[in-house]
UniProtKB/Swiss-Prot annotation:
Binds 1 zinc ion per subunit. NCBIfam families: alaS. Belongs to the class-II aminoacyl-tRNA synthetase family. Its cofactor is Zn(2+). InterPro entries: aa-tRNA-synth_II/BPL/LPL, Ala-tRNA-lgiase_IIc, Ala-tRNA-ligase_IIc_anticod-bd, Ala-tRNA-synth_IIc_core, Ala-tRNA-synth_IIc_N, Ala-tRNA_ligase, Ala_tRNA_ligase_euk/bac, DHHA1_dom. This is Alanine--tRNA ligase. Keywords: Aminoacyl-tRNA synthetase, ATP-binding, Cytoplasm, Ligase, Metal-binding, Nucleotide-binding, Protein biosynthesis, RNA-binding, tRNA-binding, Zinc. The lineage of its organism: Bacteria, Bacillati, Bacillota, Clostridia, Eubacteriales. GO terms for molecular function: alanine-tRNA ligase activity; aminoacyl-tRNA deacylase activity; ATP binding; catalytic activity, acting on a protein; transferase activity; tRNA binding; zinc ion binding. The gene is alaS. One of its GO terms (cellular component) is cytosol. It comes from the Bacteria. Consists of three domains; the N-terminal catalytic domain, the editing domain and the C-terminal C-Ala domain. The editing domain removes incorrectly charged amino acids, while the C-Ala domain, along with tRNA(Ala), serves as a bridge to cooperatively bring together the editing and aminoacylation centers thus stimulating deacylation of misacylated tRNAs.
Length: 879
């Protein structure tokens, strides 16, 4: 056979269809674009759905791809069998209203028998029961043996997914047996035994089905084919499973080397080897597509795969984190086809390392608890772990439910999944209840949520900061009312408003509401569940009635500051992507008049030099004095234009796109300045982590940034005055003083040790004989732990057959140290047990070895009682 290596097979396929006038497209991201029905791309045609449905025009009517895919529906079988996997590459060629059966059938035969040189006598074809057209083309346009063609029913050879485009398919199979099927029943039997395996599926999309068995011919027919690259490699390399083909075998061998085991010698070991081999491929490709480990969605899938692989590595005896280096094999073998793997190599390795280290930290603790629970189950002859116990492992140690299930299954046990989900639901309810408020600014929230759906409230504040409106509804406390008077705190709903309601992280506007008979302050603006804009108003004077005309005026100075901060978050978002990478996505924001807060996905703390670069980029955009334009367009048009958005959110068909020149382009309904220069200055004041994989930046702009800089300048001036140096010399002066302080502290410590050593004779003279052991106890003051340990060593060396316990009170706390020589230990003395009891009396804890132990306490007034207890404890221990 001409081609056998996996990479060569991929190239041969794509080149073949390029020769048939197909446009070769690079693999799409594993993250579906504009398709909420999928968590991850799981088929070759999945990214091409818009072309098949007519929503988008394909770049060409003939396309060929090799699409990376991840499927986790069979994850529990991965490793258990040798044919299941989560990651695979799907070769495909597609026609959008161009060629059909007459062309693709002979092309498929040409590729398999001509290019790949597969023996024709080993190839079998299945067609749909009634597809005479396909049969005709197979028998007239190829030289396939007619006795190798079998007609099968709908479940085998008709592609249909609910209502919509569908059609028959023809599949090409390869025989790995000398048995020759003479009828369709025997063919199916051999297929079920994996003696004949499917290689290529050609789908003929020619009908529009209603999902009830009724079909109409489509005006335009399509071709959708799929051939798994790994399965093709199994055939071409004459292997028994995907784990034996070149690319996967390289990974598997590397894992075996790390664990010092061989594949094929032990079934349990083989399972772990296969799981790691498969999962590292999914992990590597998912991270390269900017998926981050998390507890939700596709991030959870990644975390689950990574933790499952890490646990099986530990099962194999691999002590240290290894997945971050194992991905090198994937990148080396697949890098020629997926160039972004090499480009993102360091990033991929770093994300894996951080996540694996984090999991290994908790794995030991969690496994200890789970092993204890397993032991209890077995002792009690029980088979099911309580859901509450499983949830505690998830909540405390980050054990995914699936991981706990898998470990239990290894022990022939199971998890009460209903109980687990019940605990999860109750925790979410508690969190939701904690977030709820029944009252806001004196108004019952439930009352606000039932404001009539007939009332229309329109926001008209992008261009206006004041306008005339009609009062439609008034709410005073829990009650709807027809009027409010001076002193009332109430909700006012008008037919139109210039006030922006809190949304998308931007706080609501404030201002005034008035007419000839009434004056009030608008303290806040929000939306209720029904989307009505509601003003929280403090009535200052007069009376306001339903139906009154009022003037609404926004506090424009405050709004301008909000606009500065909101536009700055857009510039910050773009700068973070540029500096940290395309994996950065907005995870939340808060935009007020005096500051901004921006949450984003990132796997580690942002380095100081990275923060400085981000800040510099934002200020460069500000100083460029770039116009900020807002445009309303169709959602799809906005996406196609490259506008950034949180596309998991629900958007209307018409959206606003805010564009700051070449610096930023985002979908946004908030208010913005019309020129970046109006931001004035941007200053980051903090950066920290708020959750695993999520960071937060807080910043100020405009006058607040000026104030912040001024405060720091005054502080530097004050510090330089105290240090009697220039501001430039502050760090030098502080380094000098820090060095001097450390030297003085060292001198003090040495002096304390000398003074303590002077008491050595007094300490030794406190010795008492307890059942043949010399027990020494003594209380000191202001001696640190290191010095106390040194004194214990001196006493031990001077007093034979001894156990010594010394305490020292420092700053209201107690340090304890105990030591025993070999002779005392041989008689039963145990420092760890002695010090544990003594520390308990002192309100602390600790422990250690028989010959040495340390502890701490917080009750210095109990030192005398603790020392007295030592004699009793030793007496119980000595043989």
């Amino acid at each position: 056979m001409k081609f056998t290596k996996t990479n060569d097979l991929r190239d041969a396929y794509l080149k073949f269809f390029e020769s048939k006038d197909h446009l070769k497209l690079e693999s799409f991201s594993l993250v579906p674009q504009n398709d909420k029905s999928l968590l991850l791309i799981n088929a070759g045609m999945a990214p091409l759905k818009p072309y098949f449905t007519g929503l988008q025009e394909p770049p060409k009517k003939r396309i060929t791809t090799c699409q990376k895919c991840v499927r986790t529906g069979d994850i529990d079988n991965v490793g258990i069998t040798s044919r299941h996997g989560t990651f695979f590459e799907m070769l495909g060629n597609f026609s959008f209203g161009d060629y059909f059966k007459k062309e693709i059938i002979p092309w498929a035969w040409e590729f398999l028998t001509g290019v790949l040189e597969l023996p024709k006598e080993k190839l079998y074809v299945t067609i749909y029961l009634d597809d005479d057209e396909a049969y005709e083309y197979w028998t007239t346009l190829t030289d396939v043996d007619k006795t190798h063609i079998f007609r099968l029913g709908k479940e085998d050879n008709f592609w249909e997914h609910g209502a919509g485009p569908c059609g028959p398919c023809t599949e090409i199979h390869f025989s790995r047996t000398d048995e020759v099927p003479t009828n369709s029943e025997k063919f199916v039997e051999l297929s079920d035994e994996d003696k004949i395996i499917e290689v290529w599926n050609l789908v003929f999309t020619q009908f529009d089905g209603d999902g009830k068995g009724n079909y109409e011919k489509l005006a335009s027919t399509n071709i959708d084919t799929g051939m798994g690259l790994e399965r093709l490699a199994v055939v071409m390399q004459n292997k028994n499973s995907i784990f034996e083909i070149d690319t996967l075998e390289n990974i598997l061998k590397e894992v075996g080397n790390l664990a010092n085991v061989k594949y094929g010698e032990d079934n349990k070991i083989d399972v772990s080897l296969r799981i790691i081999t498969d999962h590292i491929r999914s992990i590597t490709f998912m991270i390269s597509d900017d998926i981050m480990p998390s507890n939700e969605g596709r991030g959870y899938v990644l975390r689950r795969l990574l933790r499952r692989a890490a646990r099986h590595g530990k099962t194999l005896g691999i002590k240290d984190a290894f997945l971050c280096n194992l991905c090198d094999v994937v990148i080396r073998d697949c890098g020629s086809a997926y160039s972004d793997l090499e480009a993102k190599k360091d990033y991929i390795k770093k994300v894996i390392k951080i996540e694996e280290d984090k999991f290994r930290e908790t794995l030991d603790s969690g496994m200890e608890i789970l092993n204890n629970l397993i032991s209890e189950l077995k002792e009690n002859n029980e088979k099911v772990l309580k859901g509450a116990d499983g949830f505690k492992l998830y909540d405390t140690f980050g054990f995914p439910m699936e991981l706990t299930k898998e470990i239990l299954e290894d022990e022939d046990l199971s998890l009460d999944e209903d109980g687990f989900h019940k605990e999860m639901k109750e925790q979410r309810e508690r969190a939701r209840s904690a977030r709820k408020t029944s009252n806001y600014m004196g108004t019952d929230v439930k009352t606000l949520d039932v404001i009539s759906g007939e009332i229309e409230t329109t926001f008209d504040g992008y261009e206006n900061d004041s306008l005339i409106a009609e009062v439609k509804t008034l709410v005073n406390g829990e009650d709807f009312t027809n009027s409010i008077i001076e002193g009332n705190n109430a909700v006012v709903v008008t037919d139109v408003t210039p006030f922006y309601a809190e949304m998308g992280g931007q706080i609501g506007d404030t201002g005034t509401i008035y007419n000839d008979n009434f004056k009030g302050k608008v303290l806040d603006t929000k939306k209720n569940i029904g989307g009505k804009i509601i003003h929280f108003v403090e009535a200052i004077s007069g009376e306001l009635k339903v139906g009154d005309k009022v003037k609404l005026e926004v506090d424009n100075a405050r709004r301008e500051n909000i606009k500065r901060n909101h536009t700055a978050t857009h510039l910050l978002d773009a700068a973070l992507v540029k500096v940290l990478g395309s994996h950065v996505h907005q995870a939340g924001s808060y935009v007020s008049a005096d500051r901004l807060r921006f949450d984003f996905s990132h796997f580690e703390g942002v380095k100081e030099e990275e923060l400085l670069k981000v800040e510099q980029l934002v200020n460069e955009a500000i100083m460029s004095v770039t116009p900020v334009n807002t445009t309303e367009m169709d959602l799809q048009e906005a996406k196609n234009s490259g506008a950034v958005g949180i596309f998991d959110d629900k958007y209307a068909e018409k959206v606003r796109v805010v564009c700051a020149g070449e610096y930023s382009k985002e979908l946004c309904g908030g208010t913005h300045i019309d020129n970046t220069g109006k931001i004035g200055l941007f200053k980051i004041i903090s950066e920290n982590g708020i959750a695993a994989g999520t960071r937060r930046i807080e910043a100020v702009t405009g006058i607040e940034a000026y104030k912040w800089v001024n405060e720091k300048a005054e502080l530097l001036k004050h510090i330089s005055g105290k240090l009697k140096c220039s501001e430039k010399e502050i760090t030098i002066k502080l380094d000098q003083q820090s060095k001097e302080i450390k030297e003085k502290e060292k001198e003090i410590t040495n002096l304390k040790s000398k003074f303590a050593s002077m008491e050595i004779n007094d300490i030794i003279n406190s010795v008492k004989d307890v059942k043949g052991i010399n027990v020494v106890t003594y209380a000191l003051t202001d001696v640190d732990g290191e010095a106390l340990r040194g004194l214990c060593e001196k006493v031990r060396d001077k007093v034979n057959n001894s156990l010594t316990l010394l305490t020292s009170s420092i700053d209201g706390k107690v340090v304890i140290c105990a030591m025993a020589d070999k002779e005392a230990v041989s008689k039963g003395a145990h420092c760890g047990k002695v010090i544990k009891e003594a520390a308990t009396i002192l309100g602390g804890g600790g422990g250690g070895r028989p010959d040495m132990a340390q502890a701490g306490g917080k009750l210095p007034e109990k030192i005398s009682d603790a020392l007295d207890s030592v004699y009793k404890i030793v007496e119980t221990l000595v043989k």
